[in-house]
Amino acid sequence: MAVYVKFEISQELEEKTAEVVANAEKIKKGANEVTKAVEKGIAKLVVIAQDVQPEEIVAHIPVICDEKGIAYSYSSTKEALGKAAGLEVPTSAIAVVAEGSADELKDLVEKLNGLKA
């Protein structure tokens, strides 16, 4: 497990996260864009790939999410995360800026916050 992975998520929760990302109206992709979205406080949910090398690229993201009170989750691979976001290329991180279904997102955030407690 990578150093920046603070908790493990089930396959079911990973699939639910991918669904929320796929249904999102607007996303930011890549570690730099995600960092900016979190720092500005516009991110509703952040998803980080677990296979990023070197790990330092995304290691700061869970820390700033905790500081800003933004929920975050993990994807098993960069490829899976890119595919969920509708991209043809892998991506290290995604920030959902405008959700597709607010209820879906709220339910997922509650489950993720329960894992961190």
From Swiss-Prot:
Alphabetical list of SUPFAM superfamilies matching this protein: L30e-like
Keyword Cytoplasm set for record: yes
Location relative to the cell: Cytoplasm
Temperature dependence: Optimum temperature is 36-38 degrees Celsius in the absence of L7Ae, 48-50 degrees Celsius in presence of L7Ae.
GO molecular function, one term: rRNA binding
Catalyses which reaction(s): Endonucleolytic cleavage of RNA, removing 5'-extranucleotides from tRNA precursor
Gene3D superfamilies documented for this protein: 3.30.1330.30
Pfam families registered for this protein in UniProt: Ribosomal_L7Ae
UniProt EC number: 3.1.26.5
Keywords: Cytoplasm, Endonuclease, Hydrolase, Nuclease, Ribonucleoprotein, Ribosomal protein, RNA-binding, rRNA-binding, tRNA processing
Function, as annotated: Multifunctional RNA-binding protein that recognizes the K-turn motif in ribosomal RNA, the RNA component of RNase P, box H/ACA, box C/D and box C'/D' sRNAs. Part of ribonuclease P, a protein complex that generates mature tRNA molecules by cleaving their 5'-ends, this subunit dramatically stimulates RNase P activity.
NCBIfam families recorded: eL8_ribo
Protein family according to the UniProt entry: Belongs to the eukaryotic ribosomal protein eL8 family.
Descriptive protein name: Large ribosomal subunit protein eL8
